[in-house]
């Protein structure tokens, strides 16, 4: 089974259930003291079709005086399935998952008083058991079935899922749960279909904060607060997935680059918030690209940045390579993201102080937009001229 190996690569005599990955590892593949099992009469609820090991394991971990990791010797051997999975992975009927959640939430609430410790455990079950019924297979049910599932999920949210737990979830999970809780089924179905189609959502910058324009965002009829859509982590990943240099061209002794972004909102076209910079090879600092033009997309899908970069300063810096960076400033953090290349490469010869240089704008080995300026000798220039002349003559014939 795939587990957090970092916590189990050495002996840990006293592991905290609430501040460790243990709450995500609730199978019964552990060693339990007999007196713990018998004192608290720990048993598997055999009527649960899936997840029957969880009540046993959770109560054992909650009631244990100490939880230890023993890595000094092999305690026992576990034989995995051929696919490395377990009964709760893969295709499980939606009502089976829902019934599992309906058993686990009140069980945990009976073990732990409301507060951070209960929330730490229920975070795990809200993340997995409670949101899985709100995936694509929900749409395979008839309307009565869909309403029944959503009403039962909503009942669990109402009783057990605090705002603190909700804030820990990925945006799509917490928004779907709130939609189910509000009975907003049409928007819930829309969100499920959009995610199934791998929709790339714009990112809104507003008052120093960052939001995902997921289904229901800034929709008065949906009645969902903005903070439900706030991106608190993972912005760099989202930007790297959606930002691209879509065009690069030589303009005299400059290079003009066009970068498409998913950024929208009142702050997205503010140069104080969004801009471009160059990262010289071998230097930690960034050189801002001055005079960048920010143009909002008419359809509200993003902002396009266009900048003309003088080549002479790049050559004079003595650094043969500069990579393009997108800078996004928010109230919480400044984001510095390498801009992936999605354009046709540019190559040519330019002169600086009577010396020839080879200019290349392309995607480097990591796929990042890079501007390369390398000094070349007269023979190389002559060879390029001969090849170009030969091609022209060949085209003329």
Residue ranges and their predicted role:
Residues 1-110, 132-138:
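Donor-binding/catalytic cores of nucleotide-activated saccharide
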